[in-house]
Amino acid sequence: MTIRAVVRGVGHYLPARVVENAEFEGKLDTTDEWIRSRTGIERRHFAAEGETTSQLAIKAAAAALADAGLSAADIDAIVVATSTPDFTFPSVATMVQAGLGNTNAFAFDVQAVCAGFVFALANANGMILSGQAKRVLVIGAETFSRIMDWADRGTCVLFGDGAGAVILEAAEGAGTAADRGILASDLHSDGRYRELLYVDGGVSTNGQSGHLRMQGNAVFKHAVQKLAETAHAALAKAGLTPEDVSWIVPHQANLRIITATAERMGVPMERVVVTVADHGNTSAASIPLALSTARARGQIKAGDLIVTEAIGGGLAWGSVVLRW
């Protein structure tokens, strides 16, 4: 008998405020056409004044619990991937725990920026395989609007706010690639590249955060190469190839990176989940948001083989292969 961490439920939450590209015209030297042609982004959601990362995460978690037909008390562990926590501490995960009314789980945050959800999934998988937890609530949640430099057209038009959640549950498998659940993961970091993507100040409880800084062209080159490599590596660990993939669910950084990575992997865009036009780059929230959205659209179905891949500041990058 082999234990697998299978997806029991998914959910997401997006703030009510929708910001179209046109809102940036007049404020910045940019246009809707410029943003669309370079990023594929048409709109994004921004949190309201006072709306926090933990609040978005709680709503996404509640949706995932409802989808799974579970109560908060059924969860043994909560892992939140975020780089925009409400406070330096306590963790967003413990705030989610309190918000859901759970008192029996252990809860902690994972910080790998845009790669955070992939790292969190891999951690949750390990906890289930080791027997530490039977059900793990894994959340990606961000309020990147708090750390934007609104004078920098190269970054502030890219990002959005939101949250997505996945509930993993221990289940018996046959130990083959036909099993449901997480089949393999592949994680990497290289701190030599910290200057390519970072925030020039820390989280603070008075709301005065630093601003995101990015060398976009350099990040693009690293992203396409490293994302394709890590996806291939995870598939190889599972004894699978790109031809076996039903869906790539990538980090929704921008359409150019998504398209170039799929091309490098030899996977047609018809088998790639794309939500970046409506959400922008929501960092650690983008993959669970895309999973939940794709399931709601009827794209992802039971038995589908899915590859998630992401890269973020650090640099940190990785992928997870799972069967729905």
UniProtKB/Swiss-Prot annotation:
GO terms for biological process: fatty acid biosynthetic process; secondary metabolite biosynthetic process. Coiled coil: none annotated. Pfam families: ACP_syn_III, ACP_syn_III_C. CDD domains: KAS_III. Its EC number is 2.3.1.180. GO terms for molecular function: 3-oxoacyl-[acyl-carrier-protein] synthase activity; beta-ketoacyl-acyl-carrier-protein synthase III activity. Pathway: Lipid metabolism; fatty acid biosynthesis. It catalyses: malonyl-[ACP] + acetyl-CoA + H(+) = 3-oxobutanoyl-[ACP] + CO2 + CoA. Residues 252-256 are annotated as: ACP-binding. The last Arg residue of the ACP-binding site is essential for the weak association between ACP/AcpP and FabH. Belongs to the thiolase-like superfamily. FabH family. NCBIfam families: fabH, PRK09352.1. Catalyzes the condensation reaction of fatty acid synthesis by the addition to an acyl acceptor of two carbons from malonyl-ACP. Catalyzes the first condensation reaction which initiates fatty acid synthesis and may therefore play a role in governing the total rate of fatty acid production. Possesses both acetoacetyl-ACP synthase and acetyl transacylase activities. Its substrate specificity determines the biosynthesis of branched-chain and/or straight-chain of fatty acids. This is Beta-ketoacyl-[acyl-carrier-protein] synthase III. It comes from Rhodobacter capsulatus.
